[in-house]
């Protein structure tokens, strides 16, 4: 129904944000990765959207990029993977890393997503491995290794902060602003300094 929604970014909650357009506040469910890249509240944003209609629920899901929206829709084609699980998968890192994990059969990375077990990860790999195209494979080997290493570092740092009691949303936002060239320990220390301000 909606191709995209453009308006003022009003507020953020656990799994959705509110965008105001023509004095109407739209509740848009989104991923942790999109939330981490949003500008300050009060600024104008545009999200590419998909509406899901069920007997007991109508919801609009939005993402900053068409690539993330396409991946969300692709994940929904898998039996047993609903909108909530798809958002969880898209929240573990960026789309390129998720695609790379699927293509390489990396169950460990996929099961980092809350609510995604080994069997579901195997089903995702089996059904999507030959369907996805990944830009990351067009880069040279060194770039691929660096990108995946950085993303794994981010995932581990986020997991560490969540263990310490911070929300995944908070952790993602802070970690994404840290210097990824640092060691995992340094990234966590830098994030904690910021969170304790």
Swiss-Prot record:
One of its GO terms (cellular component) is Holliday junction resolvase complex. Its main location: cytoplasm. InterPro entries: DNA_helicase_Holl-junc_RuvA_I, NA-bd_OB-fold, RuvA, RuvA_2-like, RuvA_C, RuvA_C_sf. One of its GO terms (molecular function) is four-way junction helicase activity. Residues 65-144 are annotated as: Domain II. The keyword NADP does not apply. Keywords: Cytoplasm, DNA damage, DNA recombination, DNA repair, DNA-binding. Residues 145-149 are annotated as: Flexible linker. HAMAP family: DNA_HJ_migration_RuvA (MF_00031). Homotetramer. Forms an RuvA(8)-RuvB(12)-Holliday junction (HJ) complex. HJ DNA is sandwiched between 2 RuvA tetramers; dsDNA enters through RuvA and exits via RuvB. An RuvB hexamer assembles on each DNA strand where it exits the tetramer. Each RuvB hexamer is contacted by two RuvA subunits (via domain III) on 2 adjacent RuvB subunits; this complex drives branch migration. In the full resolvosome a probable DNA-RuvA(4)-RuvB(12)-RuvC(2) complex forms which resolves the HJ. This is Holliday junction branch migration complex subunit RuvA.
